[in-house]
């Protein structure tokens, strides 16, 4: 008599189930990918890449990159028809840190950051170089922060601040304040302009 536990285990192993794989090719125009299923490294055909997607009147597209670790789910239990349901972090491609404070993003917040370094396409490869000029967006309890390179825009309940290098422009209920730089038009400078008094000129602005 066969052990029913062995039969159940054999049946479970024959049933299609969620698997992990590594993206091997990308077709951005059709939002499709090929994936090498682990651990056997068998490559799929072109399958839908739905990670980070919204389809409809509002559309969001974030194609996976070669080397991305993705989770695959069989459609209607058919192991020959898979769909990528999302990407996962691993020990090589780790969660990004916030350029705002250098910490991993915490629950209740969201971070979108480009230029973190492309995933390795080989098993012994390394993550690509980080691009410090790439854009990022962080949403949290302290407002919304947009950044790229050394520029940063912070929208909070108390006001809006724009920082580029050492220059900051802060707009709040008290007005607009600029620190660390000058305010200029195409013809005049606030800190360096003077006024004519007959044939003489005044000094620079005071206060």
Residue ranges: model-predicted function:
Residues 2-4, 65-68, 81-207:
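Right-handed beta-helix
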Residues 29-35:
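Short aromatic-glycine-enriched beta-strand elements
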Residues 39-46:
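Flexible glycine/proline-rich, aromatic-decorated loop/lid segments
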Residues 47-55:
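Short, structured beta-strand/loop micro-motifs enriched in basic residues and often containing a Trp
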Residues 56-70:
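Short nucleic-acid-contacting surface segments enriched for D/E, G, S/T with interspersed K/R
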